């Protein structure tokens, strides 16, 4: 029997001071965390008899217990609230996805440093630039720097073992420091120019390159002048695309947009007056929230939730909230940095504010349109299969291998809102006859649904199997053996022409065979899920096959176990470079004797 919460008795003893409150259900599960200037006043608003929004009313109906923590002030309440949300991720709070792995551009130490993408803790010695809002934005910057200044981007292990320049040198994306084709002084100058660009000093960099170009032309060094001209032209194109007219400094432009279907926050990162990129966030909104509440929750979680995130000097937002002062004070307490949150802006800053709003609105509408389209396809599938209810979870399996080598089975999961990628799974198939797809599917399904039988994971409403009659029969046998006799099974076989739109479908057994018209929404959903399972299987298979082939030629060498194989490949930067190495070069690798080097060389070069 569920516990009934006595709101009147609770409010009679509730403090009116600032603090944090936690709402629990009858099974002691945390439902919601909130903060308030006045705990009693804020909590009383939940228990009034009328005027609550439907989702808020649903939350209140589940409350069995409320706990409070009094704090010295609002700032302390905000910090405690964010810590609790981050730790427990309550279902009715506005939640951002964990984003600890935002990428940086990393410039290593050393005489010939490398540029690359870095995620995670900053342990390696060197300089870090960013964070960038997306991997796409950082790759764009690295590509530009490689074209303009040819600073190497290869891993140190690869660089250290080169005996001749690689393809990047041939296409003029690197100056070949690995084989002494560039002096340390010239390379250092290219690194300095790259740093100026990453620091946002492109105007100063352009002026410097112009002066150098004129100097080279005066000295009749036309080849050098042409190289500098190309660098300047590249920089100007970037400035036209990325720079805010009249803008400078470090700013994040943030807009929140909310409608009944969800919420979107769009963030544009500007550093040194240069737009690094932008990103959409779709926070989970558990109860009806105003756009200002979404903005306040985003700022708190995004900037307070990650101590390593670099703070700009200013945030430009499209709404105001009473918590903004507490947020800036909390950031000052935690990070020792002053930060301004601006709402009323003019000129270029106002145009960028409006651009962020437009992007947030369009992104949310596109997401909801896709979600509605997907939901309509699910309804069509339910009708075609004669189901009493619209399925909420579909799983599809596929097998991929190369003549039986490195067999991988994939499982993809879809719901009415689209793919549920966190539930995707791959299975490395072992112990079956090479090329036996039925045995491979049997193993994958047995492993997957055996775990579900043991209480791990969720059972789908419909199980799709790519492969037709044989695979469907095998899937049915596995499900019956595990006791899942009520599960809807759907086999998908390619038609005679093997073209999309001509598939033959089998429902539950091979005797219930049917086809759908090419324009059927249900068929389009089936094709989408099948193709995604195929893609996911092929990706896994290629990765497994590549890994196996990298080490297979070393596996039969006595004295070279898994650890030594890994160390060898790491030392040479890959199997290709190891293949090119001489016996003497192999013997220089850590832990490799001359005799063992001879055995390795013989194995690699045997017919």
Swiss-Prot record:
Disulfide partners: none
Compartments, as annotated in UniProt: Cytoplasm
Pfam families for this protein: GIY-YIG, HHH_5, UVR, UvrC_RNaseH, UvrC_RNaseH_dom
Classification via InterPro entries: GIY-YIG_endonuc, GIY-YIG_endonuc_sf, GIY-YIG_UvrC_Cho, Hlx-hairpin-Hlx_DNA-bd_motif, RuvA_2-like, UVR_dom, UVR_dom_sf, UvrABC_protein_C
UniProt protein name: UvrABC system protein C
Source organism (scientific name): Pseudomonas putida (strain ATCC 700007 / DSM 6899 / JCM 31910 / BCRC 17059 / LMG 24140 / F1)
A molecular function (GO) term: excinuclease ABC activity
PROSITE patterns: GIY_YIG, UVR, UVRC
Gene Ontology, cellular component aspect: cytoplasm; excinuclease repair complex
Residues in UVR domain copies: 203-238
GO BP, sorted A to Z: nucleotide-excision repair; SOS response
CDD domains cross-referenced by the UniProt entry: GIY-YIG_UvrC_Cho (cd10434)
Keyword DNA repair (UniProt): yes
Subunit structure comment from the entry: Interacts with UvrB in an incision complex.
Domain GIY-YIG intervals: 16-94
Function: The UvrABC repair system catalyzes the recognition and processing of DNA lesions. UvrC both incises the 5' and 3' sides of the lesion. The N-terminal half is responsible for the 3' incision and the C-terminal half is responsible for the 5' incision.
Membrane spanning residue stretches: none
Presence of the UniProt keyword DNA repair in the record: yes
Family in the record: Belongs to the UvrC family.
This protein's UniProt keywords: Cytoplasm, DNA damage, DNA excision, DNA repair, Excision nuclease, SOS response
